[in-house]
Amino acid sequence: MECSLQKQLFNNGDKLFSSRHNRRVSIEQVHVTDSLSVNSINLFHKPICYPISSIITSRKSKSHFSVCATRRRRVHSNSDTYVLLEAGQDEQFVTEDELKAKLRGWLENWPVNSLPPDLARFDDLDEAVDFLVKAVCELEIDGEVGSVQWYQVRLE
């Protein structure tokens, strides 16, 4: 199988919004032309290597090749706001301290004498509440109370 590779380098003048410095985007595009049999698959059909992960889409017009970029998402940023869902009540927006106070109240007034095994392993009730806030999003309460759910949200 013979392949002829053609390498093109597009040096674009668009500035990326996600960077603090004025960087230019260079896109390397490799075209592969070959004579493949009918049963084979061409895995190298116009691959484009984007050097930056924030590029969403590209547009090609008559005279130039432009790249559109977005800001970097703040996926790992923490928020202090939670949505609290209690059985029989509307959703409430609460802060982390208010959520911890509510959960502490539920654990102090637990219907059964001992806490569930995953919460009973903690020495202090505050450690159990911290574990619930950071690692769990639902507390199943024994009896007819039901469950309490909370989700971390970011308000804009």
UniProtKB/Swiss-Prot annotation:
Keywords attached to this entry: Chaperone, Chloroplast, Plastid, Transit peptide
GO terms of biological process kind: NAD(P)H dehydrogenase complex assembly
Transit peptide as recorded in UniProt: 1-68
Keyword set includes Chaperone: yes
Subcellular location field: Plastid, Chloroplast stroma
Statement: the UniProt record of this protein carries the keyword Chloroplast: yes
GO terms under cellular component: chloroplast; chloroplast stroma; membrane
Deleted gene: phenotype: Impaired chloroplastic NAD(P)H dehydrogenase (NDH) activity, probably due to a reduced stability of the NDH complex.
Gene3D superfamilies: Protein CHLORORESPIRATORY REDUCTION 7 (3.90.940.40)
PANTHER family for the chain: PROTEIN CHLORORESPIRATORY REDUCTION 7, CHLOROPLASTIC
Function description: Required for both formation and activity of the chloroplast NAD(P)H dehydrogenase (NDH) complex of the photosynthetic electron transport chain. May function in assembly or stabilization of the NDH complex. Required for the accumulation of NDH subcomplex A, which is a core part of NDH. May be involved in post-translational steps during the biogenesis of subcomplex A.
Name of the molecule in the record: Protein CHLORORESPIRATORY REDUCTION 7, chloroplastic
Organism: Arabidopsis thaliana (Mouse-ear cress)
Gene designation per UniProt: CRR7
